[in-house]
Amino acid sequence: MTDYKDTLNLPQTDFPMRANLPEREPQTLARWQTLDLYRKIRKDREGQPKFILHDGPPYANGRAHLGTAFNKTLKDIVVKSKTLSGFDAPFVPGWDCHGLPIELNVEKKLGKDKLSANAFRQACRDYAFSQIELQRDDFQRLGVLGDWQHPYLTMDFGYEADTVRALAKIVANGHLLRGQKPVHWCAACGSALAEAEVEYRDKASPAVDVGFEAVDAEAVRQRFGVKNATTRVLVPIWTTTPWTLPANEAVSVHPELHYALVKSELQNQPVYLILAKDLVDSAMQRYGVDDYEVHGNLKGDALEGMQLQHPFLDRIVPIILGEHVTTEAGTGNVHTAPAHGLEDYFVAEKYNLPINNPVDARGRFIPDTFLVGGQPVFKANEPIIVLLADSGHLLHSETIQHSYPHCWRHKTPLIFRATPQWFIGMNKNGLRERALAEIEKVTWLPAWGEARIGKMVADRPDWCISRQRLWGIPIPLFIHKKSGELHPKSPALMEKVAQLIEKESVDAWFDLDPKVLLGDDADHYEKVTDVLDVWFDSGVTHFCVLEKRRELKVPADIYLEGSDQHRGWFQSSLLTSLAIRDKAPYKSVLTYGFVVDSQGRKMSKSLGNVILPADVVKNLGADVLRLWAASMDYTVEVNVSDEILKRASDAYRRIRNTARFLLSNLYDFDPKKDKVAVDQLVALDRWAIFTTQKLQEKIITAYDRYRFPAIYQAIHNFCTVEMGSFYLDIIKDRLYTSKESGLPRRSAQTALYYIAEAFVRWIAPIISFTADEIWQFMPGDREPSVFLTQWFSDFPNAALSGEEEQRWQLLLQIRDEVNKALETYRNEGKIGSALTAEVVLYADERLNAAIATLGEELRFVLITSEASVLPFNEKSKAAFDTALPGLALEINVSEFEKCARCWQRRSSVGQIKEHADLCDRCVSNAFEDGDMRQFA
């Protein structure tokens, strides 16, 4: 048999079938760096409309985890898609560099007491730099394009100085307050602790039920509908910290819980108790009472304002409403000491209750405290319990074991203690109302984000922006020693401090002799040594970065972070921006859910479900990780597992195989010389171009709306359905067997060229390494990188009429039914390949109209050796119905010989003596002028 291989146009390309991403991606990265790609993009887009995605700074501690990898990938997808849309979309990454975790790491390595404050801060700075280098490498390895050589760092001297300037504007605009707020306090350390310094251990504590007596018992009884009674009314609270009772200022109830008035006898005296209805039985059991009556039923909000007598102090306290009250334990009535608990503080703030803190920095009661003056707080429990028992206010007492916060250094129990702090006042100069109004002007994605942040801002207390730590940006203020007032020239003084910090770092403030700035007035003023909350540091990036860098602008077009940032960065940025310039720093905000495992569990070493991005990149490649990120519905929790990543890897392979098919059939195609005019295109090729053009419109719209999973799905379907199992499958015969430079093949190549030009750009924002690799193998002259182009727009006018579109849609369905039938026959051993079959289609008028025009070329669409169409009502006995109404099929095995070149079984095989093993079409294509195609 003659070998006709040399007469075929078999696919050929140097684009590798095996991706080998872990080795190949670093080569692409090196090429981008040699090319200085980011700078080239900036130069190329100069003068174009700006699009600014502002990077929320990750914390400079530890390698990138899957959450930060997901974050940076989504941002990169947005920025690259906007670049392809023609925008000038610079991306300036940043890092959050101050704060406790860095302090702790440095302290573990070097010790805090062994270093001077300045040396300790320098060690923190050095540590942060080392972590930034690690994370920068991680993010660049993911293919994220940005100004990595000039990121913003909250510890840069210039940034620290500008943060002081931002605070100065907030001071000048009248938003700064001084007040007290409870914090975790370690008596052994003599200082406040942050959450990261707190560890929870079991502790034995006294658990007591204490009765607060209603001042106007009759009015209370009447509220519950009880008349003609003289019995006293008690409101029992349950607490494990009796030592905090001297600081009690209220009793909290939940506005929506139902409360009952319970008549009983305690300590041989009749009494009415107000208890949460759901806790009546458990409370009465605790009090050892079996005989009791439940009277009335009121919601908690009906109890608001009721006056109670403090159990041992000459103090009247109100019942107030608090959402923090639960029915998990206790009585439904919560002892509220604003100086000793955050929830107590927040709820008390709404009622303007005093912050009464009788405990000093050593954890002892101040000397004039009733009964327990001078005693350590935990030793004060016993005398307080004895006093309550003697006065008849102790309803129950026991010792319980429970989880309690301890100092991570000393392993001793902590207390909550109110200390002087600096706040941004939510109700000063209408900040809260302006924030709520501005929230409505921002586009929130998903839309529920608006209600979420709106409720948080509506309910939040003043923002405590001060911390008592070493590693942070100072709050450079002077307070009058007698009046407690700020220096009247504070904003101007802060500018002078900012200029010093710009040159010498924050040490300039801590080392500063107040006389340098205040002269003789220095004796009357105290220098503040607090530092700023790190949320303030990152919250003023709109001022320190967006406003200061020439390539950026404020407001940013979008902030994109995890949904936890409604409480964090989105809010701190909004409040500082309003306090500075009375405008939100962003036009839109996009949030995503937490990255969890396939069962919805958080990543945890103890669960053994931690997946490190570095491991994924090392084993599968960054593009697989990026494809996973794009495929996930980010509006909910984002699942990841080895199995999910394997599916992403499989999907990646389909995309790569599609690209390889396109490239391998364009090896001899020069778009300048070989493109076929639209009016000469084979109908199927015109349909393919039209379909590609239509899909591109949908994909660009999806990119503009940040609907990444829809893009992933569209590209996946394009590779597997419209192209993979339909168009590309059909045109293989034409590409391989038609005359090399004949119209049928050049028509198909023209379509493939347009598809490739569009396709490589669609995938570029998502699988960037692969897209740029494909780009290097594309035919024709082009820019050195796909990211220096825009969405492909040089499509011919291949528009189809509605009728033509409908016809091709029907052909897709018909081919699907034929394929299913052929597969069944193949599985049953009735036929070999589809080319051994001849198919008769029995079609109704609607389907007949769609396929009759194809005539002889129908077999190319169905990839069978023969295909004919007959009316539906002429079905033979051998025919069978399909799932498509109006279509029946009859499949027979061809009795003709197989063509040695195209493998179709045709009656013309053997008819031409010189080429007895070829069909007439192959003789024409191999040795004559070639066949012609009109439809397929």
From Swiss-Prot:
Annotated binding of ATP, by residue: K605
Lineage, highest ranks first: Bacteria, Pseudomonadati, Pseudomonadota, Gammaproteobacteria, Legionellales
Subunit structure: Monomer.
Gene that produces this protein: ileS
GO CC term, one of those recorded: cytosol
Domain remarks in the Swiss-Prot or TrEMBL record: IleRS has two distinct active sites: one for aminoacylation and one for editing. The misactivated valine is translocated from the active site to the editing site, which sterically excludes the correctly activated isoleucine. The single editing site contains two valyl binding pockets, one specific for each substrate (Val-AMP or Val-tRNA(Ile)).
The name this protein goes by in its record: Isoleucine--tRNA ligase
Pfam families referenced in this protein's UniProt entry, alphabetically: Anticodon_1 (PF08264), tRNA-synt_1 (PF00133), zf-FPG_IleRS (PF06827)
Gene3D superfamilies listed in its UniProt record: 1.10.730.20, HUPs (3.40.50.620), Valyl/Leucyl/Isoleucyl-tRNA synthetase, editing domain (3.90.740.10)
InterPro entries: aa-tRNA-synth_Ia, Anticodon_Ile_BEm, Ile-tRNA-ligase, Ile-tRNA-ligase_type1, Ile-tRNA_ligase, M/V/L/I-tRNA-synth_anticd-bd, Rossmann-like_a/b/a_fold, tRNAsynth_Ia_anticodon-bd
Origin species: Coxiella burnetii (strain CbuG_Q212)
Record-listed E.C. numbers: 6.1.1.5
GO biological process annotation, one example: isoleucyl-tRNA aminoacylation
Chain positions of motif 'KMSKS' region: 602-606
Cofactor or coenzyme needed: Zn(2+)
Keywords per UniProt: Aminoacyl-tRNA synthetase, ATP-binding, Cytoplasm, Ligase, Metal-binding, Nucleotide-binding, Protein biosynthesis, Zinc
Keyword Amino-acid biosynthesis attached: no
